[in-house]
């Protein structure tokens, strides 16, 4: 079982670090570039509609997946009752979700074209939610390799399908936002069918079970968690909607240029959260001291985020030109926006650690108060900054919001777990930041090793990694300790 777990963990990490970033920066970013060349502003409209669908995404789940995984993992014989009951609730929530999106679209004065594609995007989100639900059953049955395969299957299909039209010599006039949205529908549908087929071999039948008391009980238990996710979704995704509504879809495109890279980098924090949640949950339940592993995780993700930010910062312009072929004021504006997003990435990465810890602890009241305040700060800043600064103002508002939530979560964690706030070695961290930034500046601006930007990035990452070892901020032993903790808590 331990060997199975470790091999699956390695498989998940490899798949997520290779396939998903390649999809974001290869397929999605290429679609952005081509659609903006063919019909400027259309990707901005799509990006805004997609972000709006993300804001209300929690209404497709309400914590059902976690509940489903936990119950079936404890007793596999419950899978027929739990799966069928939760599937029925999922379908009911899906109808409500589409109705909610349609209503919000009307309130926001979207035209018929935008309403139509918002509906299709909403349907795609329903397919994604159903895939995640089916995956929760695979995970609960310990079908780990199958779950890993399904986790990236939709992206693989999109890479193959869209990649053919993008790079097989066909005319780029075929590449439109409509093509991209419907390609996602195809990929999600095929993935869902394959996922159902895998589960079908284990449970043999799917049967809808409408149990109203069960629905009410599940929703009531999930409300605090659902409220937290909804509030966080507002300040994570509403900025793009506000940019497009308050300015125009061209400004939304400027935000999207850097955001594609931000999302690729964000895979690091997402994987940390998935790794740590079961570890924190069991340690808290057993009354173990979570301080060492919390600060170890913080050091690891902080160092990774600083390395990425420092290595990318000096060549923001070159990177955006290479990926999107934008020039002039458009490039300068997008680059400044990207800069604020890079700084936000550091705060968000650290938020994954403390947010996961507090969620595992059940500190939902404190987190909801924090998130509500974060929403107010974000919306207030966006309303002031977007009319004047557009995407740059929204990215800056995001940075301030994420810094607020980070410091709030550190303070809450300190009160809940009596942490030593400077347990991580503040002097070493400060020295690491200074040394890494100076190294990046020297390598990039003085062309110390090469004039090729990606070689300079790799060099900065390597030298920064050496600094982290010299300053004893992290060691290979620490990484194995974290993986072993995850292994021990799940097996």
Predicted regions and their residues:
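Membrane-proximal transmembrane or re-entrant/amphipathic helices at the cytosolic face
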Residues: 441-491
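Interhelical loop/hinge segments that connect adjacent transmembrane helices in multipass membrane
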Residues: 1-6, 173-181, 193-236, 275, ...
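Hydrophobic alpha-helical transmembrane segments
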Residues: 115, 119-122, 149-201, 372-378, ...
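Signature of the first transmembrane helix
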Residues: 3-65, 98, 102, 124-125, ...
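Helix-loop junctions and terminal segments of transmembrane helices
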Residues: 60-76, 258, 262-298, 355-360
């Amino acid at each position: 079982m331990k060997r199975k777990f470790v091999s699956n963990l390695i498989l998940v990490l490899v798949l997520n670090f290779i396939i998903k970033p390649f999809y974001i920066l290869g397929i999605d970013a290429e679609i952005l570039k081509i659609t903006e060349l063919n019909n400027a502003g259309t990707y901005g409209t799509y990006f805004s509609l997609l972000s709006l669908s993300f804001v209300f995404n929690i209404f497709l789940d309400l914590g059902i997946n976690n509940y489903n995984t936990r119950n079936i993992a404890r007793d596999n014989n419950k899978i027929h009752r739990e799966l069928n009951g939760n599937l029925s609730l999922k379908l009911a929530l899906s109808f409500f979700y589409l109705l909610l999106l349609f209503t919000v679209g009307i309130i926001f004065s979207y035209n018929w074209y935008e309403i139509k594609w918002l509906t299709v995007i909403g349907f795609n989100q329903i397919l994604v939610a159903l895939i995640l639900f089916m995956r929760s059953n695979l995970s609960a049955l310990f079908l780990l390799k199958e779950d890993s395969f399904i986790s990236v299957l939709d992206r693989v299909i999109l890479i193959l399908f869209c990649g053919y039209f993008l790079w097989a010599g066909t005319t780029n006039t075929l590449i439109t936002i409509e093509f991209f949205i419907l390609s996602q529908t195809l990929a999600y549908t095929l993935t869902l069918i394959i996922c159902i087929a895998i589960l079908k071999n284990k449970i043999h039948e799917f049967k809808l079970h409408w149990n109203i008391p069960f629905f009410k009980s599940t929703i009531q238990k999930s409300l605090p968690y659902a409220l937290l996710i909804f509030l966080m979704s507002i300040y994570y995704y509403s900025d793009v909607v506000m940019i497009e509504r308050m300015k125009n879809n061209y400004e939304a495109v400027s935000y999207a240029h850097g955001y594609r890279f931000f999302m690729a980098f964000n895979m690091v924090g997402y994987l940390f959260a998935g790794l740590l949640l079961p570890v924190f949950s069991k340690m808290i339940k057993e009354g173990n001291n979570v301080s060492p592993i919390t600060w170890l995780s913080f050091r690891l993700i902080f160092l990774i985020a600083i390395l990425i930010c420092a290595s990318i910062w000096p060549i923001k312009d070159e990177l955006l030109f290479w990926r999107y072929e934008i020039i002039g004021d458009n490039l300068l504006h997008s680059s400044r926006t990207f800069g604020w997003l890079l700084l936000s990435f550091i705060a968000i990465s650290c938020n994954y650690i403390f947010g996961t810890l507090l969620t595992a602890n059940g500190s939902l009241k404190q987190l909801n108060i924090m998130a509500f305040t974060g929403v107010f700060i974000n919306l207030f800043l966006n309303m002031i900054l977007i009319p004047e600064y557009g995407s740059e103002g929204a990215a800056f508002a995001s940075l301030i919001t994420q810094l607020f939530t980070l410091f709030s979560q550190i303070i809450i964690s300190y009160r809940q777990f009596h942490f030593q706030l400077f347990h991580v070695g503040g002097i070493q961290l400060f020295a690491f930041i200074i040394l890494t930034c100076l190294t990046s500046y020297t390598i990039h601006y003085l062309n110390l090793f090469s004039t090729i930007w990606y070689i300079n990035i790799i060099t900065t990452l390597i030298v920064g990694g050496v600094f982290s070892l010299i300053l004893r901020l992290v060691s290979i032993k620490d990484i194995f300790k974290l993986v072993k903790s995850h292994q021990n808590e799940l097996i």
